[in-house]
């Protein structure tokens, strides 16, 4: 799964902006609105005037940082890193100053719109800098350095230096456990050098969060969901309990097949699964080992990888196909500048950040994607996902600055994944001419198993990345326990273990982009719930009567209008109200996941008879 690059996610230039769009600061130091006289209690009129001035300054500040981040991500050099860090520091200072000024109006009775803007202004920063000279520069430099270590990471393998992309290819294709272990350990070897910088980053970010009135950075992050931070943590626990039994069913089945393939010496029939055997560097998606775990006697009649190649797809055609999906829902075509300015393939002449991301440069229509696209099934889905971010960014661009963002950050990820759910169906592949006919029901279990290997296998990982960071920010996990606590969580939630004993200096969380990239991760867990909730509602609106997993909403313009109406709201109101606009529901509900995968869960239960499930 790939993510959208948002404010603060690219490690520097975006460190101080709304977490739903790539925006940045203007060049040169920016000044916050002048504080009201301290002798008098602030008034509602002053609060409204402050918000208007703050929005004007933030809007003016965005273009430079967005471009600085874009240039650094596409041309990684010491100079572009310096430029991005400078832009990020200036923006962080501005946003921190505005957030502190917003706190002056706590307790002032203001109209609902101003009240929401004041609240969002205090939550505008993913990692606030402490309010002291040099702190913003130090924080920005740390984040830029961490991101760049990850993005330029290479390690020695078979006599040459290889990148993450190369390593991912090995994990995807190799079935040699010794080779898998070597490559897994090789990539994780790039991260120990991040550990000290990450600890210093966490210290500075916590200091900045405390200056805004939050217990720590984790509490600040959890405050972004229109509920108390502790209530939000409890909400994620509730959702996990809804899906955990299904995950354990899948884990049990996959472990048995791995045992049959590799034997007890590599993968025992009981206990945790070895993390390097699952086809993905972080074991967050397991679809690449479908050949190992596929049902006996039942095969899929098509291979999307082969269909794409045989039909002459190249990276640009992949993106054009994604655009056509959204056009079929009634959305306007992408602007010409999208095609002129996006990075769609990996350049051969320079280092770039290959992690797929969607960008909104100017809050108008300069939207772009950046990804090193390959012609395969995974990137076919990723293209549909990333474009979902772009269409969401475009939908809310006419909102005031502080409302230009997702209803909550899980929405931004879910909207792209919602589109990808349709794009993954044989129905859609037939609609766009890649298949002559839709396979019969006998292929439902293989199809659903492939989906579950990615969608359900992801859920515990989507939860634990931020659980680890919440512990770090709260001081519950200290630097000397960074790695051991990481693996405690991976065992608890995923039922996984590393392929061998980890070195004393290991910093395995740093081998996952979103940690050095400083992108909150719970959004992806939520997105994997919301996308099925959206899909169920959309299929109902489209009049679909068959199994939920066979529904494609391609061509449903009326449904598209209602979906766009939800997107246009941005974050102008609490997310439950926005959710209700499209789904009629005001609560996140994982029952849609169960509805989608119902036939598979029953089949897995049958297959697991006699197994000692759990770990």
Please identify what each model-predicted range represents.
Residues 232, 236-246, 406-443:
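Post-HExxH zinc-binding segment in Zn-dependent metallohydrolases
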Residues 2-18:
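Gram-negative bacterial Sec-dependent N-terminal signal peptides
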Residues 35-200, 218, 512, 519-522, ...:
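N-terminal helix-rich structural modules
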Residues 37-47, 216-219, 284-300, 312-317, ...:
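C-terminal, non-catalytic "cap/extension" segments appended to globular domains
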Residues 161-164, 173, 200-370, 440-441, ...:
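Active-site-proximal, well-structured secondary-structure segments within enzyme catalytic domains
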């Amino acid at each position: 799964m790939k993510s959208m690059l948002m404010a603060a996610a690219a490690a520097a230039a975006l460190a101080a902006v709304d977490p739903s769009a790539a925006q940045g600061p203007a060049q040169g130091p920016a000044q916050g609105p002048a504080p009201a006289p301290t002798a008098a209690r602030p008034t509602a009129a002053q609060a409204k005037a402050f918000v208007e001035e703050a929005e004007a300054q933030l809007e003016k500040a965005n273009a430079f940082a967005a471009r600085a981040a874009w240039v650094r991500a596409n041309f990684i050099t010491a100079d572009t890193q310096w430029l991005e860090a400078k832009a990020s520091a200036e923006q962080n200072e501005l946003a921190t100053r505005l957030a502190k000024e917003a706190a002056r109006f706590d307790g002032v009775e203001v109209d609902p719109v101003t009240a929401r803007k004041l609240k969002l202004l205090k939550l505008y920063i993913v990692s606030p800098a402490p309010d002291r000279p040099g702190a913003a520069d130090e924080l920005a430099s740390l984040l830029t350095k961490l991101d760049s270590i990850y993005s330029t990471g290479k390690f020695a393998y078979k006599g040459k230096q290889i990148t993450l992309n190369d390593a991912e290819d090995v994990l995807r294709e190799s079935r040699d456990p010794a080779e898998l272990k070597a490559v897994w350990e090789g990539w994780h070897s790039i991260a120990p050098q991040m550990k000290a910088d990450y600890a210093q980053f966490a210290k500075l970010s916590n200091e900045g969060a405390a200056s805004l009135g939050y217990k720590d950075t984790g509490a600040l992050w959890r405050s972004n969901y229109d509920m108390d931070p502790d209530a939000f943590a409890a909400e994620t626990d509730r959702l996990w309990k809804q899906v955990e039994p299904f995950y354990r069913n899948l884990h049990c089945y996959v472990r048995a097949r791995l045992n049959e393939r590799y034997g007890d010496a590599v993968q025992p029939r009981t206990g945790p699964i070895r993390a390097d055997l699952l086809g993905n560097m972080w074991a967050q998606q397991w679809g690449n080992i479908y050949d190992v775990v596929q049902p006996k006697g039942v095969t899929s009649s098509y291979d999307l990888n082969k269909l794409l190649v045989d039909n002459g797809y190249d990276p640009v055609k992949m993106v054009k196909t994604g655009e056509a999906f959204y056009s079929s829902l009634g959305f306007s075509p992408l602007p010409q500048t999208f095609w002129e300015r996006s990075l769609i393939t990996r350049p051969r002449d320079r280092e770039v950040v290959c992690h797929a991301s969607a960008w909104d440069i100017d809050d108008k229509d300069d939207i772009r994607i950046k990804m090193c696209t390959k012609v395969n099934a995974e990137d076919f889905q990723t293209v549909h996902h990333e474009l979902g971010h772009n269409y969401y960014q475009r939908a809310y661009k006419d909102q005031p600055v502080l409302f230009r963002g997702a209803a909550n950050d899980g929405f931004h990820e879910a909207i792209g994944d919602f589109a990808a759910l349709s794009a993954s169906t044989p129905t859609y592949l037939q609609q766009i001419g890649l298949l002559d006919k839709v396979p019969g029901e006998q292929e439902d279990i293989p199809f659903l198993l492939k989906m579950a290997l990615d969608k359900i296998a992801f859920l515990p990982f989507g939860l634990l990345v931020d659980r680890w960071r919440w512990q770090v920010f709260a001081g519950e996990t200290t630097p000397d326990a960074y790695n051991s606590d990481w693996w405690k969580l991976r065992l608890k939630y995923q039922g996984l273990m590393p392929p061998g004993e980890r070195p004393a200096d290991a910093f395995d969380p740093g081998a996952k982009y979103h940690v050095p990239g400083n992108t909150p991760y719970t959004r992806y867990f939520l997105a994997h719930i919301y996308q099925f909730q959206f899909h169920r509602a959309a299929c109902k609106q489209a009049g679909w009567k068959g199994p939920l997993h066979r529904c494609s909403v391609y061509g449903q313009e009326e449904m598209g209008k209602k979906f766009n109406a939800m997107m246009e709201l941005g974050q102008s109101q609490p997310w439950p109200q926005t959710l209700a606009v499209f789904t009629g529901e005001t609560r996140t509900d994982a029952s849609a996941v169960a509805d989608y995968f119902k036939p598979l869960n029953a089949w897995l239960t049958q297959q697991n008879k006699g197994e000692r499930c759990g770990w």
